[in-house]
Amino acid sequence: RARAIESGEVHIDVAFMAAPTADPRGNATGRMGKSACGALGYAKVDSHYADTTVIITDNLVDYVHNYAIPQTDVDYVVPVESIGDPEGIASGAIGFTKNPIQIKIAELAGEFLDQAGIIKEGFVFQLGAGGAPLTVAKFIAEKLRKRGEAGGFAIGGATGILTGMLEEGLIKAIYDTQTFDTTAAASLDKNPAHIEMSASMYANPWTDCTTNYLDVVFLGATEID
């Protein structure tokens, strides 16, 4: 979608963007405020290319530091009482699985990656937010911890599980487009190695996007043929 928007294949007449914090000029961020949700990676592209961009916020401040959306991309700022509940970004899928079959699958996947030599110093990976992929991350962390190694960067959607690995030194950075829980949202504001990026930087195939550097991706699915 980011590629289609940037190429002109998809045209946006007006973009209404909820932002947890903004200033009167339109600089906006998801890092802070009572509704802090983390990265605004998808909103970055829409707000830049839309004919008209409207920022809707429940935390209007004098100045925004580390903005995701700059005032040069914004036409209107609309203060409201509430843009939503940030607790809603943390769904029941975001956590280690307790299903014994999924745990075994995750364990086997982690062991396969280790035996194949993929889990090593500096390797780059992406996690889905489902229970099985996050459980794979647990096994990866154990392997890295045991060997005293660290991965390179991880690509988010970021979760508290990923940010925990970052804080422990098991990975060196997180590139984040969409933050999946409130723990990760807090990390984005406080940790300089937790880096916000646009959806285009994440996966636009016409650019040198971060997915070009992935060694492995772990995704969960409800059904696979």
Per-segment meaning from a language model:
Residues 1-225:
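Conserved alpha/beta enzyme-core scaffold
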